């Protein structure tokens, strides 16, 4: 990849298009090892579940993942209302000395973790009005994604399938519609299970992929993080290169048809 092909979010550019979560690892040391193997530059943190200073007597993620080396992306995992999400991100901004790039997710059901879009839209408006730069976990509905962009979201993050399901990309057509209409980055968020899922997302034209369970839940998280790094890079290169059209039959054989040696009679 060239240095010119960067992911730009809220005016800041990144070489890596892979965003990685920090939950579900054995400990903070394994978290850091996986992040290093992934090559990520943006690390998402569940404020309600991860200590970043709100519990001074416990180990802090920031001791292993310092803001000087990574862009931290506080998220609202576990929030089921706009009010809870807004309060959580206000706390994150206070703990991180005014940090304003955040990931909003407002869940609608504790079993499937599907986004509650009315509450998500409500929270997006409030956060944007308060000066946050909001990346939004959302459904793969193109209309809802357009509404989020109109409200001022700096990135839309449609799910590929349910959070933690590992089912991969179930609706590539909606993702294509969202990509084609959006003027902000589109990143797949949720559902990636293995490297090929990440590659497909990038081949579709997504600007990036965010994942946690696919790496942290793998038998070897460090090796999977490395695999995901290569998959995202390879998928992006394939998208830029441009795939050949799908055809039922080959209109032009790749083997030469001229200059063939005639069979002896």
UniProtKB/Swiss-Prot annotation:
Locations listed in the record: Cytoplasm
Residues that span the membrane, as ranges: none
Keywords recorded for this protein, A-Z: Cytoplasm, Schiff base, Thiamine biosynthesis, Transferase
Keyword Zinc: no
Catalytic activity from the UniProt record: [ThiS sulfur-carrier protein]-C-terminal-Gly-aminoethanethioate + 2-iminoacetate + 1-deoxy-D-xylulose 5-phosphate = [ThiS sulfur-carrier protein]-C-terminal Gly-Gly + 2-[(2R,5Z)-2-carboxy-4-methylthiazol-5(2H)-ylidene]ethyl phosphate + 2 H2O + H(+)
Functional summary from the UniProt entry: Catalyzes the rearrangement of 1-deoxy-D-xylulose 5-phosphate (DXP) to produce the thiazole phosphate moiety of thiamine. Sulfur is provided by the thiocarboxylate moiety of the carrier protein ThiS. In vitro, sulfur can be provided by H(2)S.
Protein family membership: Belongs to the ThiG family.
Name of the featured protein: Thiazole synthase
Organism: Bordetella pertussis (strain Tohama I / ATCC BAA-589 / NCTC 13251)
Lineage: Bacteria, Pseudomonadati, Pseudomonadota, Betaproteobacteria, Burkholderiales
Gene designation per UniProt: thiG
């Amino acid at each position: 990849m060239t240095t010119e092909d960067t992911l730009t979010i809220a005016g800041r550019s990144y070489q890596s298009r892979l965003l990685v979560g920090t939950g579900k690892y054995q400990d903070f040391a394994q978290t850091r090892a996986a992040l290093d193997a992934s090559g990520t530059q943006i690390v998402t943190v569940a404020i309600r579940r991860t200590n970043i200073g709100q519990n001074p007597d416990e180990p802090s993620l920031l001791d292993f993942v310092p803001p000087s080396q990574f862009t931290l992306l506080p998220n609202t995992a576990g929030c089921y209302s706009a009010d809870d999400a807004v309060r959580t991100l206000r706390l994150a901004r206070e703990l991180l000395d005014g940090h304003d790039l955040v990931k909003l997710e407002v869940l609608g059901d504790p079993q499937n973790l599907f986004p509650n879009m009315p509450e998500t839209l409500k929270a997006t408006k409030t956060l944007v009005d308060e000066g946050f730069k909001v990346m939004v976990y959302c459904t793969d509905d193109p209309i809802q994604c357009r509404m989020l962009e109109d409200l001022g979201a700096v990135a839309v993050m449609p799910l590929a399938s349910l959070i933690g399901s590992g089912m991969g990309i179930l609706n590539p057509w909606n993702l294509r519609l969202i990509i084609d209409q959006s003027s902000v980055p589109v990143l797949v968020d949720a559902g990636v299970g293995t490297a090929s899922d990440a590659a497909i997302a990038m081949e579709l034209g997504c600007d990036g992929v965010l994942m946690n369970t696919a790496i942290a839940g793998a038998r070897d998280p460090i090796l999977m993080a490395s695999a995901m790094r290569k998959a995202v890079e390879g998928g992006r290169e394939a998208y830029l290169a441009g795939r050949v059209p799908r055809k039922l039959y080959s209109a032009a054989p790749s083997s030469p048809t001229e200059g063939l040696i005639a069979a002896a009679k």
